[in-house]
Amino acid sequence: MEMARSTGGPFAFLRPGAARAAARAGYLDLCLPLFEQPIMRVSDTGFARISGQYKGQMFDVQVVPDSLNLRKLPCLWLLVTLVERLPVAGSYNAMMRATGAETFSKFGDLQNQVAVPVGFPEGCTIRTDAVGDWPVSAVLGGYMAGLDTARLKEVVVAKTGVRVVWLVEEADRGRYLLFRDAELGAQALTAAVLAPLMDGLCGLWADVMAGAAPKHG
């Protein structure tokens, strides 16, 4: 599937207007039918955020615009979090193409960088605040191997649940270079994009739980 591109005018970033605000606030509207009793709110950036049950598990979905990295095009990150506790020792963050400018993540605060096991995607860096062995490595590596690494930015396994950070849109290169047009989110996110990400997190969470279960016999 082709990545969504911005279609705003050359000075859209200077004149937000009602249409831009409405598009951002309604960016997740097409995804609402996926959830049971969803709670929709608008974040400080103006983009929608959803919390609700999906297939019996609690999810939080938010959208984060990113225009701080001067070497990259402005983009939108989709943060999808399955908020169900896990019996793990700490937070395990696998970051793709780390730049140090990932303001949406606690990756930069984690002090313990671990060797990347065989089978993980190229360009992956792993950090944790836990000590000793990290038993989720095989599960995490298998999960990441099934994803489009060009869009994948981060996967987190933590006591509070699991998260994937996904690239859903970036600014049109020509417009941005010529006019600095960085308008994003004009087209709403579809359920066809979000549902597979949530399904994948359900599987990842279940696999981590299974790996943490006591072994008998």
Residue ranges and their predicted role:
Residues 2, 13-26:
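Active-site acidic/histidine clusters and adjacent loop/turn architecture
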Residues 3-11, 40-55, 60, 68-217:
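Charged, low-complexity intrinsically disordered regions
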Residues 22-39:
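Amphipathic alpha-helical segments
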